[in-house]
Amino acid sequence: MGPRLRGDDKLNFSLAKSQTPFIWGRFTGLGLAAGLAALLLDQAVKLWLLFGYDLAEEGAVAVTPFFDLVLVWNKGISYGLFQQESAVGQWVLLGLKLAAVVLLWVWMTRVDTKWSAVSIGLIIGGAIGNAIDRIAYGAVADFAHFHITTTAWTFSWYVFNLADAAIVVGVAGLLYESLFGGRAVKAPRSGP
C-alpha cells in the first residue's frame, strides 16, 4: 500500500496527471482529425490510382485542358527537391521526416487556436502520407499535374500529390494566422 493522500493531494495529482503537454493539448484532437483526414484521403487516392486504375500501365490522363493525372516517382522531398537515389539517402530523408513529425506534434499540443491545430495537423498528415509511400515503394507517388499551354508559351507546375497539397495548405494556414490572425500585440503607450 502506498501513502494515503488527503483530498487536496488527490485533486492535485489528478490535475497533474491529465496535463500532458508533450502528448495532448487543448486542440490536439482537432489537429489529429485534420491530419488523419489528409492522410486517409491521400493514401486512398494513391492506392486507387496505382492499383485500381493502374496509372502506371494506363499512362497519363488528360482530365481537363489544364490538369493531367500522371505517375511520377519522387525520391526527394516535396516538389522533387533533394532527390536521393541511394538507400542511405532515402532513410536519412525518412528519419528527418519522422523528427519533423514529432516536433510538429509537440508544437500542436501547445497551440491555442483551432486554426493552428488544423494547419499543423494537415502538415503532419501529409508528411506521414509521403513517408508511407517512401517505406512501401522506395519513393513518393506524385500524380497531379497542372499546366497551361498557349500558342506562345507553356507553364507547367510540379507534379504533386494530396499529401503535398495538405502540407502546402497547412503552411499557408500557419502563415495566414501569423500575419492576420490571433491576438494583436499593442505597444505600450509612453507617458502619463
Where are these regions (language model features)?
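A cross-taxon signal for low-complexity, glycine/charged-rich
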Residues: M1-G2, G7-D8
